[in-house]
């Protein structure tokens, strides 16, 4: 197996890493603007040989300049589109694939390279997932409605995936939560527990959003009254 090339087995060889202040989930899209020389070199190599790279949340440090310490668990990113700009800069569109865990880090290249192993969820029967998945879908539909109203947008029907795994990753990606919370969802190896955690998070977020929306409406009405 060539370096950096994913073969779909239980393990992988060395993988170039892109530390970000963002969590990428499997099946989700992530646009990237590449401008640092080290990452232009890394992405250039990936494009030349149809290789993947790993997106990892930064534990400490910054995205630009110097070295950042990443979390141990990240997601393989596959490049699906590239726009080349001046001075070798690039706009990328990527999609998350498998999750991985870093076993060992290397700084032999200008960028981080990790020896990684693939991780997956434990096997769980569908009947264990059906009830929490239905609750997540119902709660997220309301959460989506409220966040759309908060932005002043139109209330459009949302078409959620029926597959519990895809649903959990979609909700995790769309949830307005700290990166550390999203990272904890990524690291879970039980889909049922991931769904149950999302039920808890949505259950807290929805009343907060409802109150914020009602408060904004009261302020608008009060303002209109003063003007009149």
Name each region found by the language model.
Residues 2-228:
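N-terminal low-complexity, acidic/polar interaction/targeting segments
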């Amino acid at each position: 197996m060539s370096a950096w090339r994913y073969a779909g087995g239980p393990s992988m060889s060395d993988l170039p890493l892109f530390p970000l202040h963002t969590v990428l989930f499997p099946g989700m899209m992530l646009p990237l603007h590449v401008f640092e020389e080290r990452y232009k070199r890394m992405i250039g190599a990936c494009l030349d040989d149809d290789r993947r790279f790993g997106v990892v949340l930064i534990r400490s440090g910054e995205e630009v300049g110097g070295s950042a310490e990443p979390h141990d668990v990240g997601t393989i990113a596959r490049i699906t589109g590239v726009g080349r700009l001046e001075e070798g800069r690039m706009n990328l569109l990527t999609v998350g694939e498998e999750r991985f865990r870093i076993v060992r880090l290397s700084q032999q290249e200008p960028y981080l390279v990790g020896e990684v192993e693939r991780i997956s969820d434990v096997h769980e029967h569908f009947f264990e997932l059906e009830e929490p998945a239905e609750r997540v879908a119902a709660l997220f539909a309301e959460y989506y409605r409220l966040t759309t109203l908060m932005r002043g947008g139109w209330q459009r029907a949302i078409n959620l995936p029926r597959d519990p795994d895809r649903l959990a990753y979609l909700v995790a990606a769309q949830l307005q939560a700290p990166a550390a919370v999203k990272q904890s969802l990524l690291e879970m190896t039980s889909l049922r527990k991931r769904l149950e955690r999302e039920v808890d998070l949505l259950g807290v977020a929805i009343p907060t959003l409802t109150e914020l929306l009602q408060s904004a409406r009261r302020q608008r009405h009060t303002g209109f009254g003063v003007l009149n």
